[in-house]
Design a protein with these regions (language model features):
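Conserved acid/base catalytic micro-environments in cytosolic active-site loops
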Residues: 1-14, 20-26, 32-40, 44-356
Length: 356
């Protein structure tokens, strides 16, 4: 694996390999001594594995880390843990033949490594690392803010707030900071659209459920949105909400404007369904997905918050939404949940009967 990766990187005129670690222990030492612009990390290594190495690097000497892992169930679980610990991106190799494998994902790998090398802000991931490690060890949700909760409503004849969280690069660690605020009786439906392959989102839902009180599930076609549930958009599919509040999944259209899933498609459908009861959180990520969708929510009378540059791993998606004039509030990572909750509870307190 190391030799294959080194060959790919050395063949690129914009990249230079400055070190090669045989295990996690050496990776930690080289990160400290060489201070590279970016690190690629395997999960399965002797002595100290990729998870331990990622946690230590992000705690003591933060560097942008790109995980290289398999698409297996075990590979997905380990990769997601590494992202929670502060790795900012990953490349999933689809088979077991390493050389052929890496050639098949070569362009994706190079694109993500080049992008990671430009990341300026990594302190957010570093700050999260110790908190998440403790939570992983205890297997209990992180404490949620105390607030007045209102009983959720149900039924297709009801209207209730719908929150869309949109994230790409750096998203899993960022969502880990926000998700503990949501509780089982949160009076809104929450949809999370994270740019992620199909093989990963089922495992992502299972792992995210460990850190929050709200019900977490991978979204299913034709199910009705319900308050008190966080729906994760399945990888490789676009998620839309119909006029009757049902989830529509589209796995045949391919990429829309370069993205699969496409965040704009989800937000635009939520704006049409929930109108002024819609809320969007545009989080860290590269590109402009979510900008036009956020504009649709704002135009419909909903609230749009964007993560600020100081706490974003990549200030791409939030910046594009701000440029589009779609954002009401630009907030740090620790203030985003409170803004969403304030809006949701305000809607529930003022909405007439049958509209909540």
């Amino acid at each position: 694996m190391r030799k294959v990766l080194e060959g790919i990187f050395n063949a690129d005129e914009h990249l230079q390999v400055v070190g090669n670690a045989k295990d996690g222990r050496e990776a930690v030492a080289l990160a400290e001594s060489l201070k590279p612009d970016v690190i690629t990390m395997d999960i399965n290594m002797p002595h100290v594995d990729g998870l331990q190495a990622t946690a230590e690097i992000m705690t003591t000497n933060p560097r942008p880390i790109v995980i290289v892992s398999s698409e297996s169930h075990e590979g997905a679980a380990s990769t997601l843990r590494a992202l929670e610990l502060g790795a900012i991106e990953f490349v999933a190799k689809p088979s077991s033949a390493i050389d052929l494998d890496m050639q098949s994902v070569k362009e994706d790998l190079l694109r993500k490594v080049r992008m990671a090398a430009k990341v300026r802000v990594v302190r957010t991931a570093s700050r999260l690392a110790s908190t998440i490690q403790n939570a992983i060890g205890s297997k209990t949700p992180l404490p949620a803010p105390v607030s007045t909760r209102l009983a959720p409503t149900s039924g297709l004849d009801q209207r209730f707030p719908v929150v869309v969280l949109a994230a790409s690069t750096g998203g899993p660690a960022t969502v880990m900071r926000i998700a503990p605020g949501f509780t089982r009786d949160f009076p809104a439906a929450v949809i999370l659209v994270q740019h992620m392959p199909a093989a990963f989102t089922t495992q992502y839902a299972a792992q995210l459920a460990e850190f929050t009180g709200i019900r977490v599930k991978e979204a299913e076609a034709n199910e009705s949105l319900q308050p008190g549930t966080l729906y994760i958009c399945p990888g490789g599919q676009h998620l839309r909400v119909t006029s009757t509040g049902r989830i529509q999944l589209d796995g045949t259209s391919g990429r829309i404007n370069g993205y699969l899933p496409n965040i704009d498609a989800t937000m635009e459908s939520v704006a049409a369904f929930a109108g002024p009861l819609s809320i969007a959180g545009v989080l860290t990520g590269m590109g402009n997905d979510g900008a036009s969708g956020a504009k649709a929510i704002k135009t419909a009378g909903g609230l749009v918050v964007a993560q600020d540059e100081a706490t974003s791993v990549i200030f791409g998606m939030p910046a594009e939404a701000i440029k589009a004039g779609a954002v009401d509030q630009v907030l740090g990572i620790d203030d985003i949940y409170a803004a969403i909750e304030k809006r949701v509870l305000g809607i529930c307190r003022t909405a007439p009967a049958g509209v909540r």
